[in-house]
């Protein structure tokens, strides 16, 4: 992931957090301001939790060039946290656990609840089902990739305690991505996804409903799973495949059917 790619994604997340924070914690006197003047946010009072998907021991999928998904999740989560702190959100926490799923997922949601967080963002990168993958050679090693789909996705759970807030933030993030010329991936709606099909609840923002995501379902604050992608195709795409055959059943919040992420 290049610095430019990371910066673009981080800026969009920060923008969405700012917008949500302004709605949740308007500055003193903002309620008496003229209607045309946007509310500002008490950033020091707003706590965002940036959740790193997967663990060192269960690193998720493998990219088209042999890099574990966890490495990308950690890199992006670090950048998001740093940018939020730099923007004045001093209470931002990057959440990492070593416990294997599903117990680790439950622990992460419980930690966010204990912190009384205002927002929960889970960072993941995606791939397609295994049967859609092709093989190619990179640096004398064989890896798998897929050119079939591209785009980002935002997941929310209707079982989250703040369903309306989750949808609000998901829409803010998705629309910010679209404003930068990115498109959401439609492949989650297709029959080829089988039992991994998801309901598209906001086509304008690329927001999908996935009620079973543990870290979204068990948190008590607005929560979404951000699955960023760059609009690229070909073997330069960072396309993911699942490492474990049982991952879809053992890790309901980390499905095997993912898209793809960063190109090299």
Describe every region a protein language model picked out:
Residues 2-264:
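Catalytic-site microenvironment of enzymes
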């Amino acid at each position: 992931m290049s610095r430019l790619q990371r910066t673009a994604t981080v800026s969009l997340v920060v923008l969405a957090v700012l917008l949500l924070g302004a709605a949740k914690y308007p500055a003193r006197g903002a309620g008496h301001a003229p209607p045309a003047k946007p509310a500002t946010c008490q950033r020091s009072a707003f706590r965002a939790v940036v959740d790193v998907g997967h663990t060192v021991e269960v690193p998720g999928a493998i990219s088209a060039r042999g890099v574990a998904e966890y490495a990308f999740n950690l890199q992006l989560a670090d950048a998001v946290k740093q940018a939020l702190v730099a923007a004045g959100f001093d209470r931002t926490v990057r959440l990492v656990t070593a416990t294997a799923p599903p117990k680790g997922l439950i622990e992460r949601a419980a930690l966010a609840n204990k912190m009384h967080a205002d927002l929960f963002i889970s960072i993941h990168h995606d791939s397609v089902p295994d049967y859609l993958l092709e093989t190619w050679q990179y640096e004398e090693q064989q890896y798998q990739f897929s050119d079939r789909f591209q785009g980002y996705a935002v997941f929310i759970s209707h079982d989250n305690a703040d369903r309306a807030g989750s949808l609000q933030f998901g829409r803010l993030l998705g629309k910010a991505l679209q404003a930068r010329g990115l498109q959401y991936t439609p492949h989650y709606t297709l029959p080829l996804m089988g039992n991994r099909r998801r309901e598209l609840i906001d086509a304008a923002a690329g927001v999908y409903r996935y009620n079973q995501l543990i870290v979204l379902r068990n948190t008590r604050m607005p929560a979404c799973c951000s699955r960023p992608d760059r609009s690229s195709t070909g073997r330069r795409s960072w396309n993911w495949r699942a490492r474990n055959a049982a991952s879809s059943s053992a890790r309901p919040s980390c499905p095997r059917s993912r898209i793809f992420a960063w190109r090299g």
